[in-house]
């Protein structure tokens, strides 16, 4: 299980009341809040609970790795999200203004007329500020990555030879980092 230093709880605490939720749609924010990388999925955060709705390609792995959200197999996004919004009595949903297109926002507004979708609430900025302050877990990952990079680069310096292309050297470095 991945521990993300309570990032979901921090976001939930920023919500104004029990009828307010945050909808996380960007890959980067999903990874930040769940510690899980995927090319699809959404996170719904309420004061009471949080949910990761994710498709079949990632579902089993997400169930194993994600601890801060209830992981739900994404089958019918419109219906599933509607049921969660109704279940929690949500009337306002903050969205990431820098991650959602106008077209996507309009679709959400059309599909969920009982909810106000707010792109001007500063959710993207709030997430950005949260990401600036590193948790102990994040610092540990940074230190580990730095050590891997240093070991790989030291090895690369021993193996690099005149006449090798940049692509070859880059491939070697990438290979060495993967080894460590």
Question: Which ranges hold each PLM region?
Answer:
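Flexible, acidic/His-enriched mid-domain "rim/lid" segments that flank
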Residues: 3, 79-180
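N-terminal accessory/capping or targeting/presequence segment of soluble
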Residues: 1-88, 147-148
């Amino acid at each position: 299980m991945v521990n993300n230093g309570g990032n979901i709880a921090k976001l939930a605490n920023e919500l104004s009341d029990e009828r307010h939720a945050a909808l996380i749609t960007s890959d980067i924010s999903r990874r930040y809040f769940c510690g899980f990388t995927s090319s699809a999925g959404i996170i719904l955060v309420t004061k009471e609970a949080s949910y990761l709705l994710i498709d079949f390609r990632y579902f089993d792995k997400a169930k194993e790795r994600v601890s801060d959200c209830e992981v739900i197999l994404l089958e019918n996004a419109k219906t599933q999200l509607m049921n969660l919004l109704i279940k929690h009595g949500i009337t306002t949903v903050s969205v990431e203004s820098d991650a959602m297109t106008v077209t996507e926002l309009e679709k959400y507004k059309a599909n969920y007329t009982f909810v106000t979708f707010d792109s001007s609430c500063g959710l993207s900025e709030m997430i950005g500020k949260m990401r600036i302050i590193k948790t102990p877990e994040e610092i540990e990952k940074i230190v580990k990555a730095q050590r891997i990079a240093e070991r790989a680069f030291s090895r690369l310096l021993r193996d690099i030879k005149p006449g090798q292309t940049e692509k070859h050297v880059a491939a070697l470095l990438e290979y060495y980092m993967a080894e460590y």
